[in-house]
Amino acid sequence: MIQQIKPSIRSKAISKISKATYGLLVGACCLLASYDTLAQTTSSSASLQQNQTPLKSFQGYYQLPNKVAFISFDEQDNSLYATQLWDQKKRYQLVRKDDTRFESKNEGYSIAFLKNSAGDFSQAKILGRIVCERVPFDPNKIASLTASQLKQLAGTYLMANDNNLKITIEPSAQGIILKQMWDNKTISFTPRSELFFLNEDGTFPLTFSVANGKVEQMTCFEKDLWLKAD
């Protein structure tokens, strides 16, 4: 004869089954919540990456305040790299911190890209204090200028804070020749752009400034200003 299960035993069995079922339900809910959180995190991360400024927007050449040194930025394998165009062209891989801020992977050097009023990236701030200007030329390559482009630079220049000091600029086959009138020393320069020149070893920069279609002044190095006299 089949024995009937006593009520107390039946109640305990139901209680155990209920607890087991509850545990399974809780586990399933936690698992689903984990998947949902992971999906949201992945979706948010993907959305953030899609909204980030493309690395190619930062590529180019940037000139340090001393006018002699340059840094280039280029994209490679979905990473941004910075290369010093001096000191044996040391190269740094950069790690993105947010949309426009990066750090060198091994050294932790900070780099922030800044926009101008037109919304274009025009500067790079190195180490939080050194502002480098983006330039539209490759400082390693000699530019080809016409005779008329070189001729507009020719003339006599007076030092801004001492008119007794004079230099002359004359066109040459390779670029221009600067002559110091106080000692007759001459230095040859080749163009990197229409208005930027370097001497043979790249340690002496000349930057010409134009206003109203005419060359009005020349800056040697960072702040050595000369005014065109003719």
Regions found by a protein language model. Give the residues of each.
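Cleavable N-terminal signal peptides
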Residues: 26-27, 37
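N-terminal secretory signal peptides that target proteins for export/translocation
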Residues: 1-18
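Sec-dependent signal peptide recognition
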Residues: 19-25
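Peripheral terminal and inter-domain segments
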Residues: 40-230
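Secreted/luminal cysteine- and crosslink-motif detector
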Residues: 30-31, 133
